Amino acid sequence: MTSNLEAQLLALRQEGEQAIAAADTLERLEELRVSYLGKKGQLGALLRSMGQMSAEERPKIGAIANTVKEALQASLDKQRESLESAQIQAQLDAETLDVTMPGIYKPQGRIHPLNGIIDRALDVFVGLGYTVAQGLEMETDYYNFEALNTPPDHPARDMQDTFYLPDGNLLRTHTSSVQIRYMEKEEPPIHIVAPGRVYRRDNVDATHSAVFHQIELLAIDEGLTFTDLKGTIKVFLQAMFGDLPIRFRASYFPFTEPSAEVDLQWNGRWLEVMGCGMVDPNVMKSVGYDPEIYTGFAAGFGVERFAMVLHQIDDIRRLYASDLRFLRQF
């Protein structure tokens, strides 16, 4: 019996070493470990038959069994190290950057000049404590005109100046309508800035477009004066254009009283850049505010005009042409 069991152990060693050497994955190697050296493995099954042997035979077979176990374990360790090294090398080869290969061109994104002006302006006003407000581009006559103290016979209501829709609505001609809707929902104090796209029935040329962008600001509180308005505009224009001379000229807007145009001295000449004024009491009443308690100011400007001045653009149509040769300059 001893010689038979000894032969089985030696055959198991030879078979196991060959199988381990042929294992090509760590998963397969683990299967072989369990098969040969696990609790229910082949080596354990052979050793359980030692109970039938005499006391003199057991030490010899036990020594052979330990030798077989150590040999198989050594083969497992060696093959595991080899497979792990190969796995790491394969991963390194896959992730290695070949600096001799040509690069892949990735076009660099640019900020459109209109978006750049809007972002800069909003940053200034948000820094002053204003909240950004958005509104509808398709409006009713009430919010676009009537609530803003624009009477039915005002030239702005003319079919030649406004895009009227078949259902009686219109495309907003300014972002002032955002202010009315906001005031209807909120109580003073209010400090908002409203950017957005607006529409006018203008003939498209180098300085006019039927679609353009405005940014308007509104402040409502107790005790606000024209001095507060002037100070706010000066801070804003200095942030956008630098410390340049500005002036206020008397003007007229139906929704502000008094009203003014703001000029900026740019390259030796005065440029009209903004309109502004104190909110008309009739506008206050239309949203349920008491003009005896609250005062307010409003101002607005065209984003395209700012972009054309700051970037020295001679034709507003360039801003909408999607010409990459032009846009890559910004």
Swiss-Prot record:
GO MF: ATP binding; magnesium ion binding; phenylalanine-tRNA ligase activity; tRNA binding
GO cellular component: cytoplasm
GO biological process, one term: phenylalanyl-tRNA aminoacylation
Positions with a binding annotation for Mg(2+): E257
InterPro entries in UniProt: aa-tRNA-synth_II, aa-tRNA-synth_II/BPL/LPL, Phe-tRNA-synth_IIc_asu, Phe-tRNA_ligase_II_N, Phe_tRNA_ligase_alpha1_bac, Phenylalanyl-tRNA_Synthase, tRNA-bd_arm
Top class in the EC scheme: ligase
Compartment annotation: Cytoplasm
Cofactor (UniProt): Mg(2+)
Gene3D superfamilies: Bira Bifunctional Protein, Domain 2 (3.30.930.10)
Catalytic activity: tRNA(Phe) + L-phenylalanine + ATP = L-phenylalanyl-tRNA(Phe) + AMP + diphosphate + H(+)
Segments forming a coiled coil: none
Protein's name according to its UniProt entry: Phenylalanine--tRNA ligase alpha subunit
Family: Belongs to the class-II aminoacyl-tRNA synthetase family. Phe-tRNA synthetase alpha subunit type 1 subfamily.
